[in-house]
Amino acid sequence: MDDVTIVTAFFDIGRGFWSNTHKRTTKFYIQSFLNYLDYPYKIVCYIDDRCIDYVLEHYTRSPHRSVTFIPINLKWLEHNIHAWKQLPKDAEIMKSSIYKDYLNNRLTIMYPNGVRPGKDVIKMFPENEIPEYNAINHAKIDFINHAMQNGYIDTSVTCWSDFGYFGTQHKNDQSTFPKGTLDRDRFSKDRITFFIQKEIVEQDIDPLYILVCAPEMFTGTFWGGPTNLMPSFQALYHECVEELYSVNISDDDQHIYLRCCLKNADLFDLKLNATGEWPKGLLFFQKKS
């Protein structure tokens, strides 16, 4: 068995009923996840208990037996996951007049010279309006540490890979899928590896700029590194979330990864993705034939 564990999770926050371009159905997520079962990846999967029977039925037909499934529900999240316990805080901030003013000034901050392309439309993203979206994304590091604390991980490297990875990164196109499993030696031995879409510059230090302009920088679909660094990363992550709360900002995991890196750059190994597409982590870290 390879010395790498993948942790992933799915909890239905109602995204299938969203009426915008960010809509994704439960079917989309499940069909994406089933592709994992074609590989001998060692996986710890936290899965909505409303979906687990369907997935387990498919798992019985998989040639591999390397997935540990943990059923979850709302009560489980409220009891076990720090990020979910913070959900009321995210909701409170999103409803506040201060936060709404930040976002209502989005066009002014993005175009301080007054020159704006196209129509003056203030675009909102899920991380600005849906507290459950932020909570479930902040929970990634909490799921990893829960798996560690409960003995589900015995490998030297641990990765987060999104439940819907094959759908979002590969469009479920099997011709683009990885051919092999993950190579422990391709990960940094003393840092956590993240893909970034652009270099960090001085203006990125300002959390209000990141909230309002929402540049594509850190990606949260796939990241990983030495298992023994995950508790330190969790503590740093929680600290950075609290710092944003203190200035009345709720934002998604991509913003928090940036804040963590600014606070402790030595913890991170950053891979600049220059393809113009979202990075395919399972492909990048696969064993070379």
Positions of predicted regions on the chain:
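N-terminal anchoring/stem segment of glycosyltransferases
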Residues: 1-135, 139, 143-154
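A structural signal for short, well-ordered beta-strand segments and their strand-loop junctions
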Residues: 6-7, 44-47, 157-162, 193-196, ...
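Conserved catalytic core of nucleotide-sugar-dependent glycosyltransferases
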Residues: 165-241
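Short, flexible loop/turn elements at secondary-structure junctions
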Residues: 10, 47, 73-76, 148, ...
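Non-transmembrane, aqueous-exposed alpha-helical and coiled segments at domain scale
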Residues: 142, 155-156, 183-184, 196-200, ...
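GT-A fold catalytic core of metal-dependent nucleotide-sugar glycosyltransferases
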Residues: 132, 136-192
